[in-house]
């Protein structure tokens, strides 16, 4: 067997008859499967042991030879070779067809490859193949046209007219085969190339298509007549098994039925031919044979599918490959694994960041082989069998062994759906009682898990390498940052936030205010004994915390703080400043001086002079974690997170915050606000009845009135809220809930959406505290139901988007250090109208500069060319007033099949420079797809007549961008650069005309009357600028401008959608995806190259083809860039394995086979499919081809052997 990690590429071609015979171990002549009495395979049948191999290991059919010692002997009685039964999965048979049969893929596919080769319509082909018409093969001296069709009657008439043997005409696949044999590829290709020089329109398109197919046959060495089969391969029996069920009946694969039909019809045809039966009977049998083979290859592609019992269509060979249940997606890209378990999860608040709790029963089952090995090693049992019995009996001694075995052996936990790479992380197992897995509360956010019945799967990495990989790369404590934006993903939530919020509150005049303590212990003692409250402001000696980074002026003084904050700062990393205020200045620059007492100053005076600080909220904790990570990296951060979690839980328990109905305040002037709104609505309706406004205007005014009323109530709520109210604390701290929840409890519920998505005019005036009336309750249910259905639909949509994104970018890997390009991307802040969606500072962080950046006023060089921009550097550049910077970008990277380190920048998940081998394509796809579920589904209606366009937002807009579709509400763009000289309105046609005067001429653009204009007379516009509001169609922009403009536009559009929903995604992820959409060009004029016009090809391949021609002084080919949606881009990839496993499997394989395509296995997917180690991380060639250096003495002795081995390795590669 060839070693899978040894071969470099995989090719697919058409199989010639001789090739099929070379695979076969014998002809299947009978339709029998197994004998109903003996249950042994029948001779010469579909399960024959002579052809396919023995059914039992090392045993022939008759039982003369048993045992491995007879290996390789062919039994003289039954003719079966003594070998492993596994060969029944590998050995193929064949059927000699008594009449040629066309292969349905090549005849029926779109476009029909057979039709293009012969220049016949698929309709004509069908008539010939299914014996409805004759086709003229050789007219000899008659005036008949070759390839013309004749009906039965015309054929007889022509024979009488010209005499027998005066011309040749046939029907059936045989006729097609004769025609295909006559095709002279070289002559046809030359003729078509001539025709292309003058042809245009439909004629040209057809010629290009034919040329494409003929050229494919010519270059690949496939012969066109191989599209017609004379011999049919029979796949190995274990791939179409028959299994006995409990009731003595058999369940068999559908393929056996389909093969049986072919054999039956083939044998009947053979008999008819022997008997010299009448032509019409033979024809009918040949047609039935053709249909049987069609059904076997692709049942249902032509006519009605052949059905089994219960009128269920049978699954043919094509169906075995297609779809989610097909071979590719079900068995090759994802397999079920052993050493795995699944259970409900429960919270494990006492676990460390890198631990998870595994139930004892589960662990003993998962680690059984390891435990058994130890039992034998400790000599508790003599052999493995006895050890297994010990484990199964539940011997007391196995538990101690289990503890030893699982120490330092990480396990993987996964929660479905795995939307990004944080959905699988490694933990060290801790044995626990019970049956639920225990999960650390902080990793819940990454998994999107909660403990309301979620289940998780556990997997055990077995080999040493797998364990090392899990420990070094996947340990949960290492995954602090989210790969999508580089922000911490393990921020405390809910109780932890609430506990720390309560702990860091300040309050005036509580017991113990103004006490001074010598150190933390004294303060805690006073608190425990009731002398001081957590929130009291007290003094503490600075010298009791010598390791904190105090300023010199602050040492040896007394600092004002609270007992809670002393405890809070006690868990902080030593080198962080003492946190007194929840802001970044305190965190980065140190504690403000106003909290320190001058010698002899009265502490009470200082306390009275200070305002009360707000407590630390969720956002502040996130900032502290980010800062900690920036300074101390993972180990210290994960330890700190555990301390933060424990402190939060402890104090939220002590605080005992609860929610009762009395905690919901009553707004005193609610009735006034609502009456005023009613009054206003009445006025609006009056105005409408008098005809002063349209119905649309009235609707907008009414809904606005109610919205304002709700906002007024909300504002009143915020003004009157008590900071110590438990609901307010939960909301304010970011632990749970937001102002909208609070205002529904205490204010009013407000406007609801009707089932059609339109907002209803009647608001819900009650809140939940007062209770809703029946009608109001009924209105509420619309919204609730819509929410549920939207979520369900959105999840499926978002999942499919992720799948397409992963597919298109799976081969983008960091392949080299520096591609050496001299191009770059000029970036500035992304704005949407007036507001900034993404600042320049955010966009610069973690990127490399392309040119040096200078201070706009002083001209001082802030940072050189090709330098990494850190967070501090980015801030410095923006503070200097720089508005645009040219950076290295994925868009302009010159690396083939991937990106280089400098164009990519830092790896957001680690905060360090990205390493060669990082699969950045997959990470990008997950980063864009994972937040997809958070985006809305709706299309906003800008109500009223203000515009006739609906702005698509949320998930539909993202799909629109990535599929490069024509957007809804498309903007009109200008093709000339110049000034807007006139905008004239034409009332008769309900349009406006915009005139743009450029250097080369005047551009005239017609826009709809209702469109909102983006330009005014006198404005200067660039090519490709939008004249009206709306989305630009990217394909149109590509025609007017260059690739880079389109890439920049798409990047900005994607960011607008995500940022408007509060989701942050790193630019580089979007860049990777967009670059994949623009990596192809279409050849316009081939020049002196041997490219075909109209071909789609990779930019790099196109450049290569031109390079040689230019060097030899010829005319290079010209091309234009093509923007493809991600689905199309995935199918156009150079790897046929990746494309076939994505969508349209049969079409992709048909095309690849004709071209004799080679898959060079560059991406991740194709390597997973064939079971080769993926070329990412340490699987890259540059990491795998490291030869160990031998010692000197050995080198001298083994010199000859080494060189021979080196030669062999090189050949194998």
From Swiss-Prot:
EC number: 2.7.7.6
SMART domains per UniProt: RPOLA_N
Entry-linked Pfam families: RNA_pol_Rpb1_1 (PF04997), RNA_pol_Rpb1_2 (PF00623), RNA_pol_Rpb1_3 (PF04983), RNA_pol_Rpb1_4 (PF05000), RNA_pol_Rpb1_5 (PF04998)
Any single biological process term in GO: DNA-templated transcription
GO cellular component terms, A-Z: DNA-directed RNA polymerase complex
A single GO molecular function term of this UniProt record: DNA-directed RNA polymerase activity
Top-tier EC class: transferase
Keywords of this entry: DNA-directed RNA polymerase, Magnesium, Metal-binding, Nucleotidyltransferase, Transcription, Transferase, Zinc
Key word NAD present: no
Entry note: cofactor: Binds 1 Mg(2+) ion per subunit. Binds 2 Zn(2+) ions per subunit.
Family matches, as NCBIfam families: rpoC_TIGR (TIGR02386)
Subunit record text: The RNAP catalytic core consists of 2 alpha, 1 beta, 1 beta' and 1 omega subunit. When a sigma factor is associated with the core the holoenzyme is formed, which can initiate transcription.
Family per similarity comment: Belongs to the RNA polymerase beta' chain family.
Function (record text): DNA-dependent RNA polymerase catalyzes the transcription of DNA into RNA using the four ribonucleoside triphosphates as substrates.
Protein name: DNA-directed RNA polymerase subunit beta'
Originating species: Streptococcus pyogenes serotype M18 (strain MGAS8232)
């Amino acid at each position: 067997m060839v070693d899978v990690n040894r071969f470099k590429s995989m090719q697919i071609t058409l199989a010639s008859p001789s090739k099929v015979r070379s695979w076969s171990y014998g002809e299947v002549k009978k339709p029998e499967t197994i004998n109903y009495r003996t249950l042994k395979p029948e001779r010469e049948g579909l399960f024959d042991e002579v052809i396919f191999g023995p059914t039992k290991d090392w045993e022939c059919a008759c039982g003369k030879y048993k045992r491995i010692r007879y290996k390789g002997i062919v039994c003289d009685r039954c003719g079966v070779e003594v070998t492993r039964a596994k060969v029944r999965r590998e050995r193929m048979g064949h059927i000699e067809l008594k009449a040629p049969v066309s292969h349905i893929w090549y005849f029926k596919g779109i476009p029909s490859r057979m039709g293009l080769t012969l220049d016949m319509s698929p309709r004509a082909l069908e008539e010939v193949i299914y014996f409805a018409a004759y086709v003229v093969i050789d007219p000899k001296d008659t005036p008949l046209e070759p390839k013309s069709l004749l009906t039965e009657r015309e054929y007889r008439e022509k024979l009488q007219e010209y005499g027998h043997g005066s011309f040749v005409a046939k029907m059936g696949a045989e006729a097609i085969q004769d025609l295909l044999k006559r095709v002279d590829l070289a002559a046809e290709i030359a003729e078509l190339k001539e025709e292309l020089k003058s042809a245009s329109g439909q004629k040209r398109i057809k010629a290009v298509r034919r040329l494409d197919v003929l050229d494919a046959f010519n270059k690949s060495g496939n012969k066109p007549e191989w599209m017609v089969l004379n011999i049919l391969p029979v796949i190995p029996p274990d791939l179409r098994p028959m299994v006995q069920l409990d009731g003595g009946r058999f369940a068999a694969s559908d393929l056996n039925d389909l093969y049986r039909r072919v054999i039956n019809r083939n044998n009947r045809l053979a008999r008819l031919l022997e008997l010299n039966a009448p032509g019409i009977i033979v024809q009918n049998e040949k047609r039935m044979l053709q249909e049987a083979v069609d059904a076997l290859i692709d049942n249902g592609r032509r006519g009605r599918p052949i059905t089994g019992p219960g009128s269920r269509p049978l699954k043919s060979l094509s169906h075995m490959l297609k779809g989610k249940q097909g071979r590719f997606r079900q068995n090759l890209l994802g397999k079920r694994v052993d050493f795995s378990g699944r259970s409900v999860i429960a919270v494990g608040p006492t676990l460390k960041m890198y631990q998870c709790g595994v139930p004892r029963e589960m662990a003993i089952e998962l680690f059984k082989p390891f435990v058994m090995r130890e039992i034998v090693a400790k000599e508790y049992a003599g052999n493995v069998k006895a050890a297994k019995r010990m484990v199964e009996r539940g011997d007391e001694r196995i538990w101690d062994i289990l503890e030893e075995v699982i120490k330092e052996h990480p396990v993987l936990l996964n929660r479905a759906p795995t939307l990004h790479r944080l959905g699988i992380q490694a933990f060290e197992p801790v044995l626990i009682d019970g049956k639920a897995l225990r999960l650390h509360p902080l990793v819940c956010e990454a998994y999107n898990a909660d403990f309301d019945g979620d289940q998780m799967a556990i997997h055990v990495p077995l080999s040493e390498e797998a364990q090392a990989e899990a420990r070094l790369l996947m340990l949960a404590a290492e995954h602090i940052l989210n790969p999508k934006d580089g922000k911490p993903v393990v921020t405390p939530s809910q109780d932890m936030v609430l506990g720390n919020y309560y702990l860091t509150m300040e309050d005036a005049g509580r017991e113990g205010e103004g006490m001074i303590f010598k150190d933390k212990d004294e303060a805690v003692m006073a608190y425990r004994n009731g002398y001081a409250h957590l929130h009291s402001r007290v003094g503490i000696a600075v010298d009791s915390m010598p390791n904190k980074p105090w300023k010199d002026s602050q040492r040896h003084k007394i600092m004002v703080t609270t007992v809670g904050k002393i405890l809070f700062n006690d868990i902080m990393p030593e080198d962080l400043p003492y946190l007194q205020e929840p802001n970044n200045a305190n965190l980065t620059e140190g504690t403000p001086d106003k909290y320190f007492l001058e010698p002899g100053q009265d502490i009470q005076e200082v306390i009275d002079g200070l305002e009360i600080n707000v407590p630390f909220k969720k956002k502040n904790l996130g900032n502290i974690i980010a800062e900690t990570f920036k300074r101390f990296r993972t180990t210290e951060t994960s330890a700190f997170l555990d301390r933060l979690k424990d402190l939060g839980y402890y104090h939220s328990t002590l605080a005992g915050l609860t929610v009762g109905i009395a905690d919901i305040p009553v707004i005193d002037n609610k009735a006034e606000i609502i009456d005023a709104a009613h009054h206003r609505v009445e006025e609006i309706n009056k105005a409408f009845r008098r005809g002063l406004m349209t119905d649309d205007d009235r609707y907008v005014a009414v809904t606005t009135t109610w919205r304002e009323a709700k906002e007024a109530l909300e504002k009143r709520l915020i003004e009157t809220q008590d900071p110590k109210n438990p609901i307010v604390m939960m909301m304010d701290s970011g632990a749970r809930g937001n102002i909208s929840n609070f205002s529904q409890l205490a204010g009013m519920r407000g406007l609801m959406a009707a089932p059609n998505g339109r907002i209803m005019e009647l608001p819900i005036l009650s809140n939940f505290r007062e209770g809703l009336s029946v009608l109001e309750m009924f209105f509420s249910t619309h919204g609730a139901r819509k929410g549920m259905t939207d979520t369900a639909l959105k999840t499926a949509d978002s999942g499919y988007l992720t799948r397409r994104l992963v597919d298109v970018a799976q081969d983008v890997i960091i392949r080299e250090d520096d591609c050496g390009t001299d191009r770059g991307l000029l970036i500035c802040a992304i704005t949407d109208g007036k507001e900034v969606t993404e600042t320049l500072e955010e966009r610069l962080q973690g990127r490399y500069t392309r040119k040096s950046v200078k201070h706009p006023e002083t001209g001082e060089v802030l940072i050189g060319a090709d330098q990494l921009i850190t967070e501090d550097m980015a801030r410095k550049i923006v503070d200097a007033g720089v508005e645009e910077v040219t950076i290295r970008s994925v868009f302009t990277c010159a690396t083939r099949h991937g990106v280089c380190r400098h164009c990519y920048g830092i790896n957001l998940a680690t905060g360090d420079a990205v390493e060669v081998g990082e699969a950045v394509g997959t990470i990008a796809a997950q980063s864009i797809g994972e937040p997809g579920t958070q985006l809305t589904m709706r299309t906003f209606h800008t109500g009223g007549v203000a515009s006739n366009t609906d702005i698509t937002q949320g998930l539909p807009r993202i799909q629109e961008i990535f599929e490069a579709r024509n957007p809804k509400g498309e903007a009109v763009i200008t093709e000339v650069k110049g000034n807007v000289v006139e905008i004239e309105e034409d009332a008769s046609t309900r349009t406006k005309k915009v005139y743009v005067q450029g250097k080369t001429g005047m551009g005239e653009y017609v826009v709809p009357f209702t469109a909102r204009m983006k330009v005014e007379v006198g404005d200067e516009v660039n090519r490709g600028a939008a004249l009206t509001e709306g989305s630009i169609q990217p394909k149109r922009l590509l025609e007017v401008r260059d690739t880079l403009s389109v890439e920049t536009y798409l990047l900005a559009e994607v960011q607008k959608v995500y940022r408007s929903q509060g989701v942050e995604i790193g630019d580089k992820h979007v860049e990777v995806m967009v670059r994949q959409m623009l990596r192809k060009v279409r050849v316009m004029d081939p020049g002196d190259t041997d490219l075909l016009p109209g071909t789609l090809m990779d930019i790099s391949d196109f450049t290569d083809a031109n390079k040689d021609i230019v060097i030899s002084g010829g005319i290079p080919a010209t091309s234009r860039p093509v923007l493809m949606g991600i689905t199309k881009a995935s199918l156009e990839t150079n790897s046929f394995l990746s494309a076939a496993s994505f969508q349209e499997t049969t079409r992709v394989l048909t095309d690849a086979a004709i071209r004799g395509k080679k898959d060079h296995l560059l991406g991740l997917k194709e390597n997973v499919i064939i079971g080769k180690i993926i070329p990412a991380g340490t699987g890259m060639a540059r990491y795998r081809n490291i030869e160990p250096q031998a010692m000197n003495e050995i080198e001298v002795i083994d010199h000859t052997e080494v060189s021979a081995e080196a030669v062999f390795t090189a050949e194998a590669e």
